[in-house]
Amino acid sequence: MSSNLTSNEMSSTSAIVEPPEAVKGNERDKSTRRSTSQVVRPEKHEVENALEDQCSSSSLPKEAQYYAKLDKKLEGKDPRSQFYEAVRLSADIFAHKFEKAVCSRQTFEPTNSIIKVLNTAEEEMLHEKVVPLPVSSKLQYYLNRGRYDTIFDRDEQLQRTADPMADEPDHVEKRVTSILEQASREMEEGEVEPVFYDGSDEDQELPIDLGAMRNLQRTNKFAARSSRMAARRGGRPGYRGAFRGAARGAPSRRPAPAAEVAPETPVAAPMAPAAPAAPATPEAAPAAEVMDTSIATEMPQESAVDLSNVSAATEMDTSKEGEASRPTSEKKKKIRTTEMDRLMSMDLGPKDGGRVGELGHMWPESRRRPAAPLPETPAAQPRKSLPRRAAEKKKPEDSDAAEEQEVEMEVDNDASTSTPRNARGGRGGGNRRGSRRGQKRTSGGSGKLVEPKKEPVDEPAEKIPKRSEAAPEVPATATTKEAPPSTSSSPPDAPATPATPASSDSRDSPRKIRAMIFSLTGSPPESETPPVLQQEQVISTAAPTAGRHPNIIQQVPHINRIPPQPLRRLTAPQAPPASQPEEPPVQQTVPVVKVELASAPAPIVRDPQSTEPVPPAMPTLVENNHEATLILPPNKTSDYTRWNAQDLINWVRLLITNNVDSTIAIMVREEFDGETLACLVLDDDFRKEVPIPYGHYKKMKIYGTEVLNHYRTEKYQADLRKFHEELAAWKAQQR
C-alpha cells in the first residue's frame, strides 16, 4: 500500500464524512466554550446514529449487514471456522467505526458485541493457541499509521474517569493489540509467508501482514509518547496534536515552560490528514525526510503506509530524554488484574510439543509448569526410546573416529604441499559433516587423498568397514538376525565383553546391553521392529549372544516365548501368504469340507412354488360396439406398452388417410407413445384435454380398443399356460 493510495483514501473518506456548515459552526462554538475543566460530550445514541448514517454513505456496508453476513457464514461450520469469521468481521466493524470517529472528531465507543468477540478471541488465543489469520486490512492500515492510541483527547479522558465505561475503549485497543502481537509471534515462528491485500475482494480472508505487525509495537509507542510530548509543549494530544510539536520545529527536546503554553489552542479545527506530511520549518524538513527513508527501509513496500504522518512521531521518539524526564510517580496502570490472575492460576500443560514457553508474557517463571520429565523405569519405558539411546551411544564413537580421521588428514595435507586444502572439509570444531567428508577423502588406511564422492548413497557403505575395524571381535554374521546357533560357541566371541566400556556397570539393563550390541554390530537402530512382527527373528538373535550376556537368555526368550502361540492359533484358519510354509496344510482343509458335503445325503430340491399355484384371473375386455379388425404397426405385436412415438404415428397413418398431418402434429407436440393408447381408449375425457378432430379420435378409439382387448387376451393365455406348468410341477412334488 503506497503513500499515494493512503492519501487518496483518506481524502475520499474525509470528503464523505465532512460535516455541514451548521455542524462546523456548532463545533467552533463548542471549542470556544470548552476548557480543561468542562468538556461537551455528545450522547451515545447521537454518536451511533451519526455512525450509522456515515456507514450508509460510505463504501462499507452497515453493521447490521455485517452481522447478517456473519450469521449466514457461521451456519453449519465448525467452531474454529466460526472463530475466524467472527474475528475477521468484528475487526472490520472495529476499524470502520474507528475511521468514522476519527474523521468526524467524535468519541469512539465500540459496541458490546465487538467487545465480546474480542474477549473470546483473546481467550481462544491464550488457551487453544489459535492464530486468527483473517484480519481486516483496514485495522492493519490504522495500526501502521501510528494513530491507534490517539483516539481520545487527554482532557476528555480525564473527564471520563468517573464513568464506569470510560476505560472500555482502551481495554478493547489493548486486547486487539495483544491478540495481533500474539498472532504475529506465532506466525513468525511458523515462518508463514506474508500475503498482502490488494483491496480487490472485500470478503478475502487475509493472513496478517508480517511486515506491518513487526512495526506494531513501535508505532503504538510512537503515538503514546508523541501525545505526552505534545502536551508538554502546549499542543493538544488529539488527532493532530501528536504531530503538532514536531511540525513547529522546536529545537529543544525538553518540555516547554508553563508560561509558553498556549491555552487557547483551537480544538475543533477541520481535520487535514495530509497536512502533517510537510514540515513547517526548513530545519525540520531534512530530519523528517531522513526518518521517512529509514522507516521505508525497515518496513515492507506493501505495509509502509502513510510514512509522512509517522515521520514526525518517529523523529521525536529517537531520543530517550522524554522517557527519562517522566516522573517516577507515573506508573502504568494494571489492567484486568482478575483476568490476569485467573490465567496465571491455570495449568494448561505442554501443547504441541511443549510450547508453554511462548506464553512468557503472561506467566512468570514461578508459575510455569516444570518442564523436567519424571524418571522412567525400564519396564514403563516405550520401545521407541531404544533407537534414541543407541544413537546417543553412537555419537562419542563417531566423534572419536572423526577426530582421528581429521588428524590423519592434517598430516597428509602438511606432507603433500601440492594438494590444496578443501574449504568445505576443514575442521569445524565437532562438525559431523566435515568429519564425514574427511572419511570420504581417504581411501582405506593409506592416507592418500581422493576426490570426494558426490553421491550421498555411498556414505553408509563406507561407514561399515570403519566400524568393523574399531570392533573386529564381533562377527559380521551378527548383523543379520538369522545367524546359526553354532556361532555362539566360537572362540572369537569370548573377548567381545571387554570391548564395551559400559559393560562393567552392574546397573545396565538388558535394553542398554542390546543398544550397545546394536552400536557395535553396526545394525541401524531404526530397523528394529516390535516383537509381535519379528518373534522368530528375535529368538534366533538371542542364541549367539548366550555366551556373552547371560541376562539376555533370562529376559528375551521369556518375553517372546508366549505371544507366538495365540497368533498361530488365530491365523491358522485363514489363508496365509504364498511365502509361508504352512500354506499346503491350510489348502488341504478345503477338499475335506467338500468330501463331507458330497458324502452327505442330497437334500430334497423343492420347487420355489411351495404352495398350490393360483390360476390367473379372467381378462377385463373393453366393450366395442363396432366391428373392427386388428391393425398393428410394422414389426410390432399387440403389446402396446413397447410402442414408441414413431410406432404410434405409423399406426395412426394406417388408420387415417385424409388430413392426418394435423393429428400427427398434435401427437408430436403432446409426446404421444404406446402408453397414451390405453388412456385414449379408457378415458372418456381424453379429447377434452387434447384437441384431436372428432373423426380421427373416434377411429383411433375403435381400433385402439381392439388392440387393447387382443393384448389382454394374449396375456391371459400366456399366464394360463404358465399356471398349468406350475400346477403339474407342484403335483409331482406332492407325490
From Swiss-Prot:
Effect upon mutating P633S: In bx91; induces derepression of homeotic genes and affects sumoylation at 25 degrees Celsius
Biased composition regions of type Low complexity, renumbered to the chain: 239-288, 471-504
Molecular function (Gene Ontology), one example: enzyme binding
Location of this chain's protein in the cell: Nucleus
UniProt feature, compositional bias: Basic and acidic residues: 317-355, 389-398, 450-470
Key words of the record: Chromatin regulator, Nucleus, Repressor, RNA-binding, Transcription, Transcription regulation, Ubl conjugation
Entry remark concerning the domains of this protein: The RNA-binding region is essential for the localization to subnuclear bodies and its function. The SAM-like domain, although only slightly related to the SAM domain, apparently displays a similar function. It is essential for homodimerization, the interaction with ubc-9, and the formation of subnuclear bodies.
Assembly information from the UniProt record: Homodimer. Interacts with ubc-9. Binds through its N-terminal region to the N-terminal region of sor-1.
Functional description taken from the UniProt entry: Polycomb group (PcG) protein. PcG proteins act by forming multiprotein complexes, which are required to maintain the transcriptionally repressive state of homeotic genes throughout development. PcG proteins are not required to initiate repression, but to maintain it during later stages of development. Also required to repress expression of other genes and for localization of sor-1. Binds RNA.
Protein's name in the database: Polycomb protein sop-2
Gene: sop-2
